[in-house]
Amino acid sequence: TYFKMFNGAEATILVECLRAKNRSAPERVLKRMKQRLAAEKLRQQDEAWLVVDKDSWNGNQLQQLYQWSTGDKRYGLAVSNPAFEYWLLLHFEDGKGVNSLRECRDRLKRHLPEFHKSHVEVHKLGNGTRDAIRRARMRDQTGRQKWPKTCGSTVYRLVEQLVADEKESN
């Protein structure tokens, strides 16, 4: 997955992804996280992030995730609207004018013709991570809602920290 690229032999961070096929509803994502945290407590320097797509989930469902993320300073929430593919697209372009998931995927495939959601070829993202962070931050108009209402991604908030931690470890 995308986040595994931050795990390296020299890294002082370890990114673990809790995945479950076809169980991406916000309440299921939150349940898996709570189960994991009950089984394995966070250390002081650890963080736990929920990374979800807006998809067709409603505001009340996402609000549950947001509420959880405010319960501990080590918790975070990253939402991409319409989906994580939008965050990947920002590695290559500014993402303006994307109005649907289909359009987002079509534009992403211009840059990653072999793209498949279950296997992101991170080596093909090149040095676009910092550009993606910059572009996502510029588009971040979340305000009081805490996640993008239109096309956007707050994944940059997590990736910024991963990049900073990676830099500190080198």
What are these regions (language model features)?
Residues 4-21, 27, 33-49, 54-170:
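C-terminal accessory helical subdomains adjacent to catalytic cores in phosphodiester-
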Residues 1:
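Short N-terminal binding/cap micro-motifs at the start of the first secondary-structure element
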